[in-house]
Amino acid sequence: MPIATPKQKTTQRIKMRIHKGDTVQVITGKDKGKTGEVLRTLPIENRVIVQGVNIRTRHVKPTQEGESGRIVTEEASVHASNVMLYSNKKKIASRVELVVEKDGSKKRRLKKTGELID
């Protein structure tokens, strides 16, 4: 009898409205209300890594003889639906809409304040 192989999950890239360098505010979870800069986006997983948010402690074993192990704190990823773009001028978080300019270029705009991001 043949052995069943697990099905491969299709990796579908999700178009994200949050980009590296944006300032975002966490809207749910233990870090609710915290703001930080997006360090990295993970579009396949629909997640972002935000500076100073969702800190995890990791114990690292020594790699060479004579080296001691250490404890490292680093930011873990947060789902993109749990953050909103944050306006530093108005100090408010808002959803994002895509606006097509007359020349055909796309810009991101905050819905609450009307502030253009790109």
Curated annotation (Swiss-Prot):
Signal peptide from the UniProt entry: none
One of the GO biological process terms: translation
One Gene Ontology term, aspect cellular component: ribosome
Coiled-coil features, chain-numbered ranges: none
Keywords: Ribonucleoprotein, Ribosomal protein, RNA-binding, rRNA-binding
Gene3D superfamilies per UniProt: 2.30.30.30
Metal-binding listed as a keyword: no
GO-annotated molecular function: rRNA binding; structural constituent of ribosome
Family: Belongs to the universal ribosomal protein uL24 family.
Function in brief: One of two assembly initiator proteins, it binds directly to the 5'-end of the 23S rRNA, where it nucleates assembly of the 50S subunit.
Protein name: Large ribosomal subunit protein uL24
Taxonomy of the source species: Bacteria, Bacillati, Cyanobacteriota, Cyanophyceae, Synechococcales
